[in-house]
Amino acid sequence: AFCKAGFDILGIIAPYGSLTPYASNIIVNITIMALIIIGGLGFIVWQDIYEKGFKFKKYLLQTKIVLIMTINLIVGGAVLFYLFECQNSLSSLSQEEKILASFFQSVTCRTAGFNTVDVSHLKPSTSLLMMFLMFVGGSPGSTAGGIKTTTFAVLTIFVYATMTNKSEANAFNRRFDSKTIKKACSVFLINFIFIFISAIALFDMQPQLPMQDVFFEIFSALGTVGISTGITRQLTMLSKIVIVLLMYCGRVGSLTLALSLSRKKKISNCKNPVEKIAIG
């Protein structure tokens, strides 16, 4: 749980059941959720908290963004999961168990790989929600995958600043530099390209597979989550290779991988002239 592997030996209780037999066990759920959250915050954040205690105003900008984003994603994801699945996969549980399962699924999507409900019976809206959470993932310097909470936060703030006609993107009285924004845009676009190419490849090789399940598998692999709707066993050798490559890209990091493949260029003082083009 801490390292976001998602492996378990609970198949001896229920084949491919993960933690579904413990959906109502508060101790198991809270323990696993705590390990997932601790591992997903990142060592930079924990170092900052250790040095400055619980004084939020003194934290680094990254620590503030990570904590705020983590809380929002967990609570928001849990509320939406509950609303979507209350009369579906959660219908057999009590009210308290529904809330517990909703929070667990919201936490585990970023990016642990355990589940306490049957993922194969989720509604399309819930699957999309989980894909979003898997895509965002954890935080930089952690054991989690995804584009990271800081990347999503920077992009969101930058888009808001653009829509409100502000010249700069600011958060907690700090300004994001252009290099940070460029990196965030690059990470988002590179991951989107990985998803698009992988989807085309899998649909071409195995067109009989449901679209929802294929995309779920892709997001889960790229986010190094490990949750599956059950189609992994149906994948051909080539399809599995695609999934393996996605997991590798997700673990190494899309931007790191792209930079490692690019050639080093000499820094030049000469710049091309600027010319504006229409956007949107």
Label for each model-derived stretch:
Residues 1-280:
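Membrane-proximal intracellular helices of multi-pass ion channels
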